[in-house]
Amino acid sequence: MPMVHDTEGMVNIGKATQGQGFVHTITGFTPKQKLEEQKDLLVAYNEGEKSAFVGGTVPLNFRHALAQIEVNAKNAKPSSVRVEVVGIKLVNLGTKADLALPSSTTADRVVADPAANTNKTLALDSWTGLQGKDTPATAYYKNKAASDNVLILTDQFQSIMFGADRFMVIPQALTPWDGSTSTTGAYLAVLCRISNKSGDNYSVIYPQPKAADN
């Protein structure tokens, strides 16, 4: 019995295909663009006769189907430069794919010999038909909410996620952006303001101030 689950309950995700009464594939799964609207996706499989399970209860050991990304940053020169972060983006990742659900029992992660347990995670090739790469308009993003403070970077790494949530994206191999004028290749964008610091005085150097700015 393949099962799909998110952190808030059973859900209909994409389009499910069936064979011999079992759901085998979720097609067209697409994570939300806004971080705060994304959900985790868990899958599990078990089978057997009812009489084999104590009290008729079937144990299900769920696996995370998505990749979790947390972004951390620091400022190498906090004494002379101030960096204020107000948003982040993951750009040009694939945004839609099909997931083949497990067809064998997802075993318990807690085993006497963890090295012997090869069934802890879903294989990367469980996801196929990746679409949407190199499309900047569909970037995953998180912006500072009105109630959030601007994040001022220090010389220690800190999360710039504006909360406990993490990006939940389709696992995939990425080709990095090459730093040219090309619009292809994956990259992380940080929306920030950078200022030179002299005592208690600051002068903005990025983005370049306009004449109308005070």
Positions of the model-derived regions?
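Extracytoplasmic cysteine-anchoring/structural motifs
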Residues: 1-214
